[in-house]
Amino acid sequence: MNPIYINHILPWHSITNKLSSPDHYLLAMDVSDKSGEATKITIQEPKADTKGKGIAGALTAPVVVAAKAAQRPRKGWKKGAAIFDLTLRLSAIAAGFAATSLMATTDQTLPFFTQFFQFHAQYTDLPTFLSFMIVNAITSGYLVLSLPFSIVCIVRARAAGPRLLLIILDSVMMALTTSAASASAAIVYLAHNGNSSSNWNAFCQQFNNYCQQVSNAVVASFLAAALLLSLVVLSAFALRKMK
């Protein structure tokens, strides 16, 4: 048998183009034997059967599953952070309302009095305590109004707009609450201990219930400020993870 010599082969890019098509392809070669007689050989490749498709699907499936597995933890983390944000807001609302109600109901009258004086103390006697009550009432109202935005962050975990708005307003309310609580804490300290240099006498020994209720209100306000700080840190961390 005479050897066959290949004179011409289709270019490689044309072969690969045909390989990528779902239909069968024809690979044509011009060959010639030693006598110079040209012969054309055609090789037909059948269509990819279902078994081949199954193999191709098996090869691509791990990539899709890996991508979904990589996205699911991130989305779950963001949703969990949003739920934790809502929980912190509810706790801050409770602390803010507690501080407001405790200060608003602070009132004590001593059982003894003179012909010209009656010993009575309430929060409106000091402008610091009045400002404290107003600031905590505003903070509590803001936290209630911020609940829908927190719920939006749960439903749409990748929404950056509501989080950015919340982090700005939370920072403002945290600053107001902290300043009001700090000023009231200074007054409470003087009420308990007095100041001999300024000749301010401690009056909490006489108005014990009054001072105790004011102290509880200040503690609740500091708790609300700490929860607001936690909300700011949580929102900032969530925004950083969105990049």
From Swiss-Prot:
Glycan attachment residues as annotated in the record: N195
Q: Where in the cell is it found?
A: Cell membrane
Q: Which residues lie on this side of the membrane: Cytoplasmic?
A: 1-79, 153-163, 238-243
Q: How does it sit in the membrane?
A: Multi-pass membrane protein
Q: Which GO terms describe its cellular component?
A: Casparian strip; plasma membrane
Q: Which UniProt keywords apply?
A: Cell membrane, Cell wall biogenesis/degradation, Glycoprotein, Membrane, Transmembrane, Transmembrane helix
One GO molecular-function annotation for this sequence?
A: protein homodimerization activity
**Keyword Translocase part of the UniProt annotation:** no
- Sequence intervals crossing the membrane: 80-100, 132-152, 164-184, 217-237
Which InterPro entries does this UniProt record tie to the protein? CASP/CASPL, CASP_dom, CASPL
Which residue spans belong to the Extracellular compartment? 101-131, 185-216
User: Can the keyword Electron transport be found in this entry's annotation?
Assistant: no
Q: Which Cys residues form disulphide pairs?
A: none
- What's an example GO BP annotation here? cell wall modification
Please give the family membership noted in the entry. Answer: Belongs to the Casparian strip membrane proteins (CASP) family.
PANTHER family from the xrefs?
CASP-LIKE PROTEIN (PTHR36488:SF11), CASP-LIKE PROTEIN 1U1 (PTHR36488)
Record text on subunit structure and interactions: Homodimer and heterodimers.
Function as written in the Swiss-Prot or TrEMBL entry: Regulates membrane-cell wall junctions and localized cell wall deposition. Required for establishment of the Casparian strip membrane domain (CSD) and the subsequent formation of Casparian strips, a cell wall modification of the root endodermis that determines an apoplastic barrier between the intraorganismal apoplasm and the extraorganismal apoplasm and prevents lateral diffusion.
Q: What is this protein called?
A: Casparian strip membrane protein 4
- Tell me what organism the protein belongs to: Populus trichocarpa
